Amino acid sequence: MEEDNQEIQRDNVGSSSFFKTCFNALNALSGIGILSVPYSLARGGWLSLSLLLLLAVTAFYTSLLITKCMNADRNIKTYPDIGERAFGRPGRIIVSVFMHLELYLVTTGFLILEGDNLHNLFPGFTIEMIGLRLNGKQAFMATVAFVIMPTLWWDNLSVLSYVSMSGVLATTVTLGSISWIGAFDGIGFHQKGKLINWSGIPTALSLYAFCYGAHPVLPTLYSSMKSKHQFNNVLLICFILCTIGYTSMAVLGYLMYGSQTLSQITLNLPIHKTSSKVAIYTTLVNPVAKYALMITPTVNTIKDWFPSRYSKKAYLHLLISTFFIISSVVIAETLPFFGYMMSLVGALLSVTVSILLPCLCYLKIFGNYKKIGCETIMLFGMVVMSVFVGVIGTYIALRDIIGSV
């Protein structure tokens, strides 16, 4: 009853409708991860699809835990608030570090993706400005950052939902275009692939985890929603749709290119085909649509460090957002390895913020760790699994990155 009363109190806060929240959540959960799932399947083999489904169920369950934690205290608005409610000031700091580092590296991955695909289409592109010459991927990363920048100046998620619609549409069109290429443009679905590749399982698992790493954004979406009692329905719809999309893309891409599948399926496509260009161009919409949504929690956190008379100023939001995208460009051009970077994010950060931290915070807030039951045993099992995956996956990702520098 107390939980219901808290939900009713919270219903008066927020401006986003059910459908707008759905679009924002779909935009956060879907996106560039869908381009890497064929590569993940190629690394792990057909049986690794079971890991994708297991992670989908696990991530959905932990998203419900986040909602329960927010309902435990009506003052909780963000993911770091959950950490503080559970473990005090140290909990807030730990959650903040992992959450914001994940969001930062994911958005950096957006720029790497853009640079890779645009360079594949236009290999001779260069930019000369104030005595500086940028070639190929570097030039495209800088150009895309300039295009994305205006979307960062909106801090209203209700407004951003309209941008999110374009991101969701782009993901759908990309999946449809790649299906068309396989069926009608001479590629076919003839590759048999391997049943399982044990050496590639850690990388596959890390990349699958990356696909479900949107948990840091969920408290922001929850706080922005009018009818918060419907948020669990939003999560269910979004996780089902995204998992169908991820599974479909993984199977189609692996059947098309087998062991030759690259870290982004769009890099395998024959660029002279119209359908390939449609897939690539629509793929390029996703970073534009997602960047602002993903970076909003980090920007809001930094704004809260300033005195209240400054934190509400529009120019502060503009300055912080602009700094973030400029620094993302620097990192992207220094380490332009999409597959390895996303594998690192998945293993070290997505597993932590999407599985480990929600379980630990829930156990502490509700005191479940004090009593042995089926739920407690399951949660501790998820904690052990996430630590194991995180350690092994992080080691392999760092090894691959260092070997490529």
Curated annotation (Swiss-Prot):
Membrane topology, record value: Multi-pass membrane protein
Alphabetical list of InterPro entries matching this protein: AA_transpt_TM
Keyword line: Amino-acid transport, Membrane, Transmembrane, Transmembrane helix, Transport
Record GO biological process: amino acid transport
One Pfam family cited in the UniProt record for this chain: Aa_trans
GO cellular component: organelle membrane; plant-type vacuole
Highest taxon listed in the record's lineage: Eukaryota
Major localisation: membrane
Transmembrane segments: 22-42, 46-66, 93-113, 140-160, 169-189, 201-221, 234-254, 278-298, 318-338, 343-363, 377-397
Subcellular location: Membrane
Similarity comment: Belongs to the amino acid/polyamine transporter 2 family. Amino acid/auxin permease (AAAP) (TC 2.A.18.5) subfamily.
Stated name of the protein: Amino acid transporter AVT1I
This protein's encoding gene: AVT1I
